[in-house]
């Protein structure tokens, strides 16, 4: 837990015994380099309820922003399953006391496209962007010793966020101000356009986009139109032709607003005011 200046107020380092039905693997223990949970520690049930109570306690006096790295596909799903298994609200990180979340890896995609002169994104020998947490940290002078340990990775993220807030304050402000679905929808409809950024096969790409539809049956799905495409040509297309434009190389991009989105909502990405 940190304050608004990213000073650590409290640290958690929790372990539980391996679940009875889990078969430990050599590769997993080589990654996190700890074996004490084979025979020691609290039960998995007790650990998850301790974490729940701790997060709820923090949220009584603060509107929490849960920051992860690649959390949309790993951490979030992991926590939801663990909470659900132990009879806890699986959406604890997003639905309690104004809590929200930011996936820092997505922020790196935006940095690679618009702010690579401020924060470094490393490349390999072939010039492909590499954005693993420890690689980005090292490229910016942050030691990644003992990376993949949960506490160490948390400090890597804190130091990276502190750096981003120092070098690109408008980007971090944009990420936090659009960290909830409601605020995100307001932001992308208010600005003249937003910038969609991604990294594909090690290369950075970006597009000016604007929302054009929201799925009435699945309101978390929003359709964006790529403003690089000529709207006159789109208006002349048939329904089937328009449907064929939805996808990676088409005029329409589908996003999920219940996840950190690859969008920068500032009117001018390089505006440093």
Question: Could you say what each language-model-derived stretch is?
Answer:
Residues 42-51:
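Glycine-rich, highly charged phosphate/nucleotide-binding loops
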Residues 264-272:
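Single conserved hydrophobic/aromatic residue that forms the stacking wall/gate
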Residues 2-32, 58-169, 175-178:
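Metal-dependent phosphoesterase core characteristic of DEDDh/y 3'-5' exonuclease domains
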Residues 178-247:
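Acidic catalytic cores of enzymes that act on phosphate-bearing nucleotides/polynucleotides
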Residues 1-4, 226-228:
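Residue-level signal for short segments within beta-strands and strand-turn junctions
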């Amino acid at each position: 837990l940190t304050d608004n200046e990213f000073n650590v107020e409290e640290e958690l380092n929790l372990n539980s015994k391996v679940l009875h039905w889990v078969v430990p693997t050599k590769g997993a223990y080589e990654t996190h380099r700890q074996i004490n949970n084979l025979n020691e520690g609290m039960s998995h049930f007790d650990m998850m309820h301790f974490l729940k109570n701790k997060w709820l306690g923090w949220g009584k006096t603060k509107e929490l922003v849960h920051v992860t790295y690649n959390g949309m596909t790993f951490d979030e799903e992991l926590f939801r399953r663990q909470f659900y298994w132990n009879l806890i609200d699986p959406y604890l990180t997003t639905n309690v006391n104004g809590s929200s979340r930011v996936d820092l890896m997505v922020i790196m995609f935006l940095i690679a496209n618009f702010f690579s002169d401020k924060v470094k994104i490393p490349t390999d020998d072939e010039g492909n962007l590499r954005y693993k947490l420890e690689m980005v940290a090292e490229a910016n002078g942050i030691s990644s010793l003992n990376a993949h340990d949960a506490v160490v990775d948390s400090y890597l993220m804190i130091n990276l966020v502190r750096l981003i807030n120092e070098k690109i304050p408008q980007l971090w402000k944009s990420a936090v101000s659009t960290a909830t679905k409601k605020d995100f929808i307001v932001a992308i409809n208010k600005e003249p356009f937003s910038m969609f950024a991604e990294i594909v096969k090690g290369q950075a790409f970006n597009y000016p986009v604007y929302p054009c539809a929201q799925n009435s049956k699945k309101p978390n799905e929003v359709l964006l139109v790529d403003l690089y495409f000529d709207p006159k040509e789109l208006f002349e297309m048939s329904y089937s032709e328009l449907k064929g434009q939805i996808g990676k190389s088409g005029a329409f991009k589908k996003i999920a607003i219940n996840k950190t989105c690859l969008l920068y909502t500032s009117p001018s990405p390089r505006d440093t005011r």
